Amino acid sequence: MAKLVLSLCFLLFSGCCFAFSFREQPQQNECQIQRLNALKPDNRIESEGGFIETWNPNNKPFQCAGVALSRCTLNRNALRRPSYTNAPQEIYIQQGSGIFGMIFPGCPSTFEEPQQKGQSSRPQDRHQKIYHFREGDLIAVPTGFAYWMYNNEDTPVVAVSLIDTNSFQNQLDQMPRRFYLAGNQEQEFLQYQPQKQQGGTQSQKGKRQQEEENEGGSILSGFAPEFLEHAFVVDRQIVRKLQGENEEEEKGAIVTVKGGLSVISPPTEEQQQRPEEEEKPDCDEKDKHCQSQSRNGIDETICTMRLRHNIGQTSSPDIFNPQAGSITTATSLDFPALSWLKLSAQFGSLRKNAMFVPHYNLNANSIIYALNGRALVQVVNCNGERVFDGELQEGQVLIVPQNFAVAARSQSDNFEYVSFKTNDRPSIGNLAGANSLLNALPEEVIQQTFNLRRQQARQVKNNNPFSFLVPPKESQRRVVA
């Protein structure tokens, strides 16, 4: 009984902490941006089963937003080794499908290998839940939670990851760090870290000896072998394997599994037959009956948390205009795991020459990654200066700081993007169209503010009947007529 009370107290305390969480503020002048650029990755690390690309987190827009970005490509039968980070992260699946696992510390292993005949003495494998992922999925990874990912299909998997280094959960500095459990891979953000002189009076011989002992590159490789023998109760030969001794450097963070990975996981067909079980919306927080059903213990709040939510080409977008495009947003209201991360995401699709009207994010920075096609984008800062005026193309990233105004017009048949937001409940204010800032002002205020005649003020206020997505001009004329 005492343990149960302690667990409940822990949950209540954790809930309060998350409810009043905050982001660290960027350093002074980091958001005094006079010019933005559409950025491509500037570093690539090859591995046996794929590669990882990164954007420089020291660039001023990344420093202002307090985030780091990477893109991982997994080939057929490629396994990304388990790792965890010092800050929460969101992963968007741009392409492909496969399986992934995430380790919830302290939660039970609920997947069990079936007992085979004649193998009664062999211990059965038990592990935590394995999930399927597909194109368009958003995966939530809490701070310090180890996860792995595997591509079991022919199509390469492309996963874009955002790490929120400004999160209050990051107790280190603003440099992103990935802690691998195995392997001898290079840290993807290591080259961006400033090199500092080591203090102390350690001899050169001692330094070389320590470097040789730690050459494996993973968490386990740094421990003394006798420590691991004691901890795992295994012999020295197994410990050498755990520490990656004599492993080929080319393997890296992504390894190829010969013959494919054989693990216990629910079949994809089963998930497709019961999509409502995987994608069902979570209860309304105001529904007391719902709270009593879904929040009655640690297993049901943490260990069974839903970790993926599809926001790709969906049949039920949040905003839809058949002539302009669609927008789908994932927030903590429909994807509660995001309340742990204090992050959210938006998927958008724009038809050719359609426009996302000028708007701004009230309470979040926006990290826009172009998935497909190209669009003409303009961004304006608080001084009325156009800090970006150019094309955003597939594979490029554009960071729009909080309250900076932005507008986009598709230049291709179908421009698609995903926008990561640094708030789990972001708000957008549109400057034009229905329900916009100007639409909500009295005509007289518009007239006096912009020195317009009354009829002109009425046109500014009412001529655009659309809210966020505006069709091409030809379609607009037909609608107005």
Curated annotation (Swiss-Prot):
Biotechnological and industrial applications of this entry: Emulsification efficiency of glycinin is improved by degree-dependent glycation with soy soluble polysaccharide (SSPS) at 60 degrees Celsius in both the acidic (A) and basic (B) polypeptides as a result of subunit dissociation at the quaternary level. Thermal treatment of soybean seed proteins leads to the aggregation of glycinin acidic and basic polypeptides (GAP and GBP, respectively). GBP improve sensory properties of meat (e.g. pork) during chilled storage and inhibit bacterial growth (e.g. L.monocytogenes, B.subtilis, E.coli and S.enteritidis).
Localization of this protein: Endoplasmic reticulum; Protein storage vacuole
Start and end residues of each stretch annotated as Disordered: 193-218, 245-294
Expression sites by tissue: Confined to developing seeds.
Broad class of the protein's primary localization: endoplasmic reticulum
GO MF terms, alphabetically ordered: nutrient reservoir activity
Disulfide bridge partners, by residue number: 31-64, 107-303
Biased composition (Basic and acidic residues): 271-290
Biased composition (Low complexity): 193-204
InterPro entries in the cross-refs: 11S_seedstore_CS, 11S_seedstore_pln, Cupin_1, RmlC-like_jellyroll, RmlC_Cupin_sf, Seed_Storage-Functional
Cupin type-1 domain segment(s): 36-240, 309-458
Keywords: Allergen, Disulfide bond, Endoplasmic reticulum, Seed storage protein, Signal, Storage protein, Vacuole
UniProt signal peptide: 1-21
Residue ranges listed under propeptide: 477-481
Database matches in Gene3D superfamilies: Jelly Rolls
UniProt motif (Vacuolar targeting signal) ranges: 472-481
An annotated GO cellular component: protein storage vacuole
Post-translational modification: During soybean germination, seed storage proteins are hydrolyzed by protease/26S proteasome.
SUPFAM superfamilies xref list: RmlC-like cupins
Binding partners and assembly: Hexamer; each subunit is composed of an acidic and a basic chain derived from a single precursor and linked by a disulfide bond.
Protein family according to the UniProt entry: Belongs to the 11S seed storage protein (globulins) family.
Function: Glycinin is the major seed storage protein of soybean. Glycinin basic peptides (GBPs), and, to a lower extent, glycinin exhibit antibacterial activity against Gram-negative and Gram-positive bacteria (e.g. L.monocytogenes, B.subtilis, E.coli and S.enteritidis) by forming pores and aggregating in transmembranes, leading to membrane permeability and, eventually, cell death.
Name of protein: Glycinin G3
